[in-house]
Swiss-Prot record:
Pfam families in UniProt: RBFA
Organism: Ectopseudomonas mendocina (strain ymp)
Protein's gene: rbfA
Protein's name according to its UniProt entry: Ribosome-binding factor A
BP terms from Gene Ontology: maturation of SSU-rRNA
Entry GO terms, CC: cytosol
């Protein structure tokens, strides 16, 4: 019977949960916004991990995103050390933070669909009367 999850996926899921707590509790930089970890992709040899984040709030502009990525990049070594203490893994991957724009794109597409449906209804109501 084949495994449903590979080892790298299990480690990535655990890292996602641990990092969410560690970033919230351990990173004391006041410039850091509300960061949400959307995914963690771990390489097969467990040497690198891409950590995908989103930044919530009204300051969802490119400068704020860049600043948050820089702060997390500077704290990557510290976070890796904390992960080493909390996870039962021999080697902890190097952390590389990337912005995940899929949430924003999904919201924009949903808004476009809702607007198109509303315009459709308006046209149907106008043609019936």
């Amino acid at each position: 019977m084949a495994k449903d999850y590979s080892r790298t996926q299990r480690i990535g899921d655990q890292m996602q949960r641990e990092l969410a707590v560690l970033i919230q509790r351990e990173i004391k930089d006041p410039r850091l916004g509300l960061v949400t970890i959307t995914a963690v992709d771990v390489s097969r040899d467990l040497s690198h991990a891409k950590v995908f984040i989103t930044v919530m709030g009204k300051d969802d502009d490119a400068e704020q995103i860049k600043l948050n990525l820089e702060i997390l990049g500077e704290a990557a070594g510290y976070l890796r050390m904390l992960l080493g203490k909390s996870m039962k893994v021999r080697t902890i991957p190097q952390l590389h933070f990337h912005y995940d724009a899929s949430i924003r794109r999904g919201a924009e597409l949903s808004a476009l669909i809702e607007r198109a449906v509303a315009e459709d209804r308006k046209h149907q109501d106008g043609s019936e009367g």
